[in-house]
Structures are given as C-alpha cells and as structure tokens.
C-alpha cells in the first residue's frame, strides 16, 4: 500500500515537472534573442553543481542582483524566485526556475498566465504559511490553484490564509518608491548609489502610506495574502518597476528605453513631495511616457482663487491631474472660517457600521494628499459635470488608495465657482450643501480653496477602497496647496 502511494506521488511530481517545463518553453519565446543569450550566459557562468543539478545558490543570486543591504530583501527575493520557479527543494534555483522568475516579474508570462494569475503566484511566493507546506512542486502548485480559486469565489478564510510580514512589505514598498526615481540613461552604479543614500529613509516613511493602503492597522505584524493581492491588483503597475530593475541587471543594459520612462519636468507639488512613484503605480505608463505635464494651476503661484483656477483650466482640452496637499482640521481650530466650515458639513456620527479610520490613525499632524485623475475638459457649471468612467479619485497620504468610477453616473466631477469642486455627488441641477451629507466616496473643496473634506462610507459614484469595505473614513482638512496639471500628448516623430 505504501509503495503504491509513493509511486503515485512520484508520477504526480513528474507530471507537475513536465507541465512546468512546457510552460517555461512558452515563456522563453517571449524573450528576444539577445535576452535569451544574456539569460543563458549569466546563468551558465555563475551556476554551481548541487546534488547533480546546476543551480544558483542563495549567495550567487544575492550577489548577482545586488539589492543593497539597507533593504534586507535579497534573501526574501531569492526564496520568491525559488517558489515561482518550483525549485524549493533543489538547494538553489535552476535555469528553468530562473526563466520563470524573470518572466513573472517582467511581464513575459503573456499568453501563458493571466495577469491576476501571475500576480497571485508572485504574492504567494512572498508568504509565510500558517501551516507548513510540503516542498514538492505538486503540493505548492495545488495550493496555489486552490487558494486562487477560493479568492475568486470570495470564500477565503482569513484565519487560514498565509501571511506576509509587514517589515518585508515596508522594505519592498521602499524599494519600489526608490526605483520610481530612476531616470532613463543613468548607469546602474548610479542607481545603487541613489538607493543607499539618505533618500531611502524618506521613501521608507512614504512606504507606510502604501502599507496602510493594504490595511490601516498600526498594530498589525503581518498582512494576509488576499489583502496584499487586492492592493496590488488595484495598483496594477506597481511591480513593473521591480521587473525593470531585474532587467537592467540581467541584460547588462544601462537603460530600457521602452520600460524606464524619462522623468520629464512635472508639477511642483509632485516633485517636492515625491508623489510621482506612487502615481505611477496606478496611472497607465503611457500617461508618463507619451505625455508632457503642463503646469495649469498652482495655488501658491496663481493664488487661492476659483476664478484663477477656471481661467487656467478652461482652455486645456486634455486629461488632467488634480493634487491637493492638506493638514487635518478639527473643531478646536482657532480660525472662525474653519469652524463655520465644520458646522456647514456636520461629520457623520459613530452609529455608522464598520471601523472608523480615526480609531486607526490618530496622528493629527499627519500630511494629507488627495487627488483625482480626470478625463476630459474642465467646465464651470452649476448644474452639470464632466469626466467619464475612466476618472478616479485617489488618496496618497496618510494611506494609499484608489477609488474608481462605478458607472452609476456619467458626471463624475463638478466645478462651480459659487459651490466649489466636488467628486462623487449625485447628479443634481443645483448643487447644495445637503448633497454633501450623503454617504459614498466624496471629495469636496470649498469655493475659496481653503477647506475641504473626504468621506468614505459606501459605494456610490466611486467605488470603495480595496480591503476598506468595513472602514468608515472621514477627514476634514485645511488646504495647504492645490495643483492642476494638464497632460499634453507628445508629437510622434
């Protein structure tokens, strides 16, 4: 009986390995000839014979990819590569595993895996299972398929999910933000020099906004696989930067002209507060590579005036990016106008179901950054709005979330000099304060560009944040700076 079971397991493992090889052959076709050459050349040159199999050991992998020690990610990425490559019990990563690892992180899995399937495999490779996994390729493959199908059906049990340590996620997010500063044409040595500079600490503080975007629990030591997957699913371009880094190293190129876009001049607020790397996680890459940012309006340059904003925005017909930097506002504020604003829009009370964000994040001195990606031309009107289903709201700090249009409405933005700027309101011929008392995902800026508020209580014109369905978030704020950037397509030569 035992021999029969063992034989069946061997057949299963052999079948899984055969499938792995067949998949890898398809991945390999997605690499061009030069990339195939460098991949094979580098692997052969550094491979070592371990138990009769040529592999890259952990030391070889970490030395070759050379992620600076300040991130403490080399060992983590090696184990991720082994799990994606199906090499957990080889004492290293073999050539098939290396091809699969590079393909997964650089987008060369197309026509073999779907995007969500690949993302799930990557995130799964980061986890620390609550229960020990058998190391055979078959059991890992079965676990992957089973867990992925359960998530798609919404049947996962949070207590049984594998988890990812928050410390690892912070380091990973910090690395992604640092890579976001790379410029086309820089040599790799300059990249590494930048990565180990003092800017890493600044990026680490911003990485906390990303971690809070996965789930805003400051006491959490780890995040569930599903939470991280859903966060990265909504920030679908986040991992591309990590793939770019692997490409630069593996293929010995100083630049990837079709991958790393040149950092052209962007908005003042975007530059000064390092917002671009976060924006590039969810705004399509072609927006940055095929468009030039045009400075339409900045409150510090043009004044805190709705008339100035209208004048600066009305003549631009393309898509725009609105950025708002602010500080929290509460009832103890000394300014009379601030108190009047708070009285005009009463806060929602705690009878609302769900967790209140204020119970999670209590630092009143924290910086707030809100914004919107707006498709179509701005128009000033008391009765009609603008934008389409490609418009979305976002919050970059103190937590990172995107709120996409739900197609409930065909008017997503309202701009009225007498009322203010509003996103997420019900369609109405007349805009009044009563509309702001409704539930939903709403961003409002008053007609003096002084104060505003953001509310996250239910699905409406915009969807709720991923993993935030049970959280009621309401923030009143005092505006520090407003910026509007136009996106002007570059001429094709």
From Swiss-Prot:
Residues 268-488 form the TLDc domain. Coiled coil: none annotated. Pfam families: TLD. It is found in: Cytoplasm. Keywords: Cytoplasm. SMART domains: TLDc (SM00584). It comes from the Eukaryota. Signal peptide: none annotated. One of its GO terms (cellular component) is cytoplasm. Belongs to the RTC5 family. May be involved in a process influencing telomere capping. PANTHER family: NUCLEOLAR PROTEIN 7/ESTROGEN RECEPTOR COACTIVATOR-RELATED, RESTRICTION OF TELOMERE CAPPING PROTEIN 5. This is Restriction of telomere capping protein 5. It comes from Schizosaccharomyces japonicus (strain yFS275 / FY16936).
């Amino acid at each position: 009986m035992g021999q029969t079971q063992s034989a069946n397991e061997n057949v299963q493992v052999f079948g899984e390995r055969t499938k792995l090889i067949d998949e890898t052959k398809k991945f390999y076709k997605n690499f061009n000839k030069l990339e195939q050459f460098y991949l094979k050349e580098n692997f052969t040159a550094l491979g070592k014979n371990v138990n009769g199999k040529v592999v890259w050991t952990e030391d070889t992998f970490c030395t070759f990819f050379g992620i600076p020690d300040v991130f403490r990610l080399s060992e983590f990425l090696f184990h991720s590569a082994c799990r994606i490559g199906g090499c957990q019990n080889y004492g290293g990563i073999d050539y098939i595993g290396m091809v699969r690892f590079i393909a997964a992180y650089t987008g060369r899995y197309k026509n073999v895996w779907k995007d969500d399937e690949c993302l799930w495999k990557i995130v799964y490779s980061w986890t620390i299972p609550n229960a020990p996994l058998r190391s055979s390729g078959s059991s890992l493959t079965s676990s992957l398929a089973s867990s992925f199908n359960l998530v798609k059906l919404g049947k996962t049990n949070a207590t049984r999910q594998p988890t990812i340590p928050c410390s690892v996620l912070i380091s990973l997010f910090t690395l992604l933000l640092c890579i976001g500063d790379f410029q086309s044409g820089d040599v790799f040595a300059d990249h590494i020099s930048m990565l180990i500079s003092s800017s890493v600490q600044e990026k680490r503080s911003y990485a906390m906004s990303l971690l809070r975007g996965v789930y805003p629990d400051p006491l959490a030591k780890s995040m569930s696989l599903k939470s991280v997957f859903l966060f990265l699913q909504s920030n679908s371009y986040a991992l591309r930067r990590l793939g770019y880094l692997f490409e630069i190293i593996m293929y010995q190129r100083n630049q990837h002209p079709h991958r790393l876009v040149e950092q052209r001049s962007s908005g003042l607020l975007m530059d000064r507060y390092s917002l671009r790397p976060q924006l590039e996680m969810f705004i399509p890459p072609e927006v940055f590579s095929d468009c030039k940012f045009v400075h339409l309006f900045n409150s510090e340059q043009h004044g805190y005036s709705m008339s100035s904003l209208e004048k600066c925005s009305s003549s631009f017909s393309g898509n725009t990016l609105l950025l708002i930097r602010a500080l929290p506002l509460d009832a103890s504020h000394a300014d009379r106008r601030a108190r009047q604003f708070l009285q005009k829009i009463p806060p929602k009370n705690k009878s609302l179901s769900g967790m209140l964000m204020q119970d999670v994040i209590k630092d009143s001195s924290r910086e707030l950054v809100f914004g919107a990606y707006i498709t179509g031309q701005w128009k000033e009107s008391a009765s009609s709005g603008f934008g389409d289903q490609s418009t979305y709201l976002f919050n970059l700090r103190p937590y990172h979330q995107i709120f996409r249009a739900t197609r409930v409405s065909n008017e997503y933005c309202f701009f009225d000099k007498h009322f203010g700027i509003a996103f997420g309101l019900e369609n109405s011929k007349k805009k009044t304060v009563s509309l702001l008392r409704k539930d939903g995902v709403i961003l409002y800026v008053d007609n003096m560009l002084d104060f505003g508020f953001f509310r996250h209580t239910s699905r409406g014109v915009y969807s709720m944040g991923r993993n935030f369905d049970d959280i009621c978030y309401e923030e009143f704020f005092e505006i520090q700076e407003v910026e509007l950037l136009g996106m002007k397509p570059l001429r094709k030569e």
